[in-house]
C-alpha cells in the first residue's frame, strides 16, 4: 500500500512511476475514481450512458477533448497520474502501461466515475466490518441480469459489488451509503442473489470470492463502477483507455464533499 | 373509518363520543400518538424509560401534572379526545371507557408517544405496498427477546411491528423511515425472525397475522409503540391509563414536521 495521506503527494509518487500497485487505503479521506478515456466519436454516447445509469456510472469528472488535465479534481495529468492503465481495442486489452503518454492524442476525452471506496470509509468509521478490506482481498463483483439503460452503442448488464453484513449492519449501511448518491448510493438489492441473476455467490465474475457466509450474514449488493468496463468490453469501441482494476485515480476531492447530507 | 382530513374537526367528533373506532386513515397528514397516563410517583421513571428507549418510545408530548391539556400538540383535552381508553390496575385492564372524566385526577401526568402511522404515509406515497393497510388489518406485532433499557421499575422486552417487503422496497423503506427518528426511525432488524427471538412469524403477539410471504418478500421489523403497553403490563404500576389499540390521539402536528430531513 502507498501509505501517503495527502493526495497531491500520492499523485507525485505515481506520476514518477515510483508506485504501480493498487490504491486502496491511500489518501483515504479523498475520492478515488474509475477512469475511462474515449475517442470523441464515442464521448457523447458514453456521457449519455452515464447520465442514464447514475448508480453504476456516477460521473465525477469530465475532461475537455484533447486536454489531459482535470482541474475540478485537482492538479491532474491523466496521462501519468494513475498507477497502471489498460489500453483496449475492440473490447480486447492490448497493453497495460504505467503511463499513456504514447497513447494520448488530441481526440480523446476523459471520464472519471465515482467508486465505492468513498462510502467504505464511513462504513468502517461506523464500526461496520467490511470483509474484503479485513481480508485484504478485492471486493467480489458479479454481472447481474439487470440491463443498464442503453445509450447509442453502449449497453450491457449492471455489475454489482457485494458485502456480507448482518441485518443490523445492513440497515446501517443503507443509511450511510444513501448519503453518497455520487458514489453508487444505497444498495440496489439485498438477500437472495438469484433475484438479480447471480447464480453462484461464491464465484464472482470480478474480484476475489467472498468467505463462507456466517449464519446471520446476508449479501448486500451495490451498483459497481466496474459496470462501464464490462459495457466497454461488450460494446467494443475501436479504442479506449481505462485504469487497471484497483489502481484508481486519486483526486483532491474529499469523500465528505460527496455526501448529500 | 372517520373520514375527516382536519385534525381539529376529527377531535371534535371524538370528543362528543360520536366516533369510537380506530383512527387509521383519519387526518392522515397529521401525527397520531400512543397514550400513557401515569400517577406522579411513576412519571419520572417512565420519562426516563422513554429517554433510554427512544426507538420504541419516542416522546412527542409530555403533559404537566394534573393538566389534561397538551398545548404543544393542539387544543387537546386528553380526558375526552381519544376514541377509547384502557384503565389498568396492577397490569390488568379494569375498564375500557370512551372518556376518562371519572378517572382523571390532579396527580396524573400524560405521555404521548409517536407511532408508525407517521412514516407509513410516506412509504405509501413512495409506491411501497403496505400489506396490513391494503388488507385493512392491524399490523402484526411481536414481543422480541431484546431487552429495553430499564428505568426505575419499568423494564421489559422490545415489541416490534413487521411489514413484509421485497428487497427493493425494504431498502427504500429504510431510507424513508430513517427520515423519521421521532416515530421509530429505521428498522431494527430484517430477515431471519429467530435472530430477535420471534418463534413464529405467522403468529404475532399483537395485531393480525400476516398473509403468507411471497417468494421475494422479507420481513422488516420496526420498534413499536406497543412496547410501553407491554412494559406497563409487566411492570404493573398500581394505576395507569392508555389508549385502546388502534384508537389513537390525533394531533395538530404534521407528520412532515417530524421529518429530520
Curated annotation (Swiss-Prot), chains A, B:
Key words of the record: Lyase
Regions annotated as coiled coil: none
Protein name: Putative hydro-lyase SAR11_0660
Domain of life, per lineage: Bacteria
Annotated organism of origin: Pelagibacter ubique (strain HTCC1062)
Pfam family, one: D-Glu_cyclase
Entry keyword Phosphoprotein: no
Gene3D superfamilies referenced in this protein's UniProt entry, alphabetically: PSTPO5379-like (3.40.1640.10), PSTPO5379-like domain (3.30.2040.10)
GO molecular function terms attached to this record: lyase activity
UniProt family annotation: Belongs to the D-glutamate cyclase family.
Enzyme Commission (EC) number: 4.2.1.-
Amino acid at each position: 500500500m502507498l501509505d501517503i495521506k495527502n493526495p497531491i503527494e500520492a499523485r507525485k509518487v505515481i506520476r514518477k512511476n515510483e508506485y504501480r500497485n493498487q490504491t486502496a487505503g491511500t489518501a483515504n479521506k479523498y475520492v478515488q475514481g474509475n477512469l475511462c478515456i474515449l475517442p470523441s466519436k464515442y464521448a457523447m454516447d458514453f456521457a449519455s450512458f452515464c447520465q442514464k445509469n447514475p448508480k453504476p456510472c456516477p460521473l465525477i469528472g469530465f475532461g475537455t477533448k484533447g486536454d489531459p488535465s482535470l482541474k475540478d479534481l485537482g492538479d491532474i495529468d491523466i496521462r501519468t497520474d494513475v498507477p497502471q492503465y489498460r489500453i483496449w481495442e475492440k473490447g480486447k486489452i492490448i497493453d497495460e502501461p504505467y503511463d499513456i503518454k504514447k497513447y494520448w492524442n488530441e481526440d480523446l476525452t476523459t471520464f472519471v466515475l465515482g467508486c465505492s471506496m468513498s462510502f467504505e470509509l464511513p462504513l468502517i468509521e461506523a464500526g461496520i466490518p467490511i470483509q474484503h478490506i479485513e481480508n485484504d482481498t478485492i471486493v467480489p463483483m458479479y454481472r447481474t441480469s439487470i440491463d443498464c439503460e442503453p445509450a447509442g452503442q453502449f449497453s450491457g448488464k449492471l455489475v454489482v459489488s457485494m458485502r456480507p453484513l448482518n441485518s443490523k449492519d445492513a440497515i446501517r449501511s443503507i443509511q450511510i451509503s444513501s448519503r453518497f448518491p455520487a458514489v453508487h448510493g444505497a444498495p440496489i438489492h439485498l438477500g437472495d442473489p438469484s433475484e438479480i441473476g447471480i447464480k453462484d455467490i461464491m464465484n464472482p465474475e470480478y474480484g476475489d470470492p467472498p468467505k463462507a457466509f456466517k449464519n446471520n450474514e446476508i449479501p448486500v449488493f451495490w451498483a459497481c463502477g466496474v459496470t462501464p468496463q464490462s459495457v466497454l468490453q461488450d460494446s467494443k469501441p475501436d479504442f479506449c483507455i481505462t485504469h487497471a482494476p484497483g489502481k484508481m485515480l486519486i483526486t483532491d476531492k474529499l469523500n465528505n464533499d460527496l455526501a448529500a447530507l
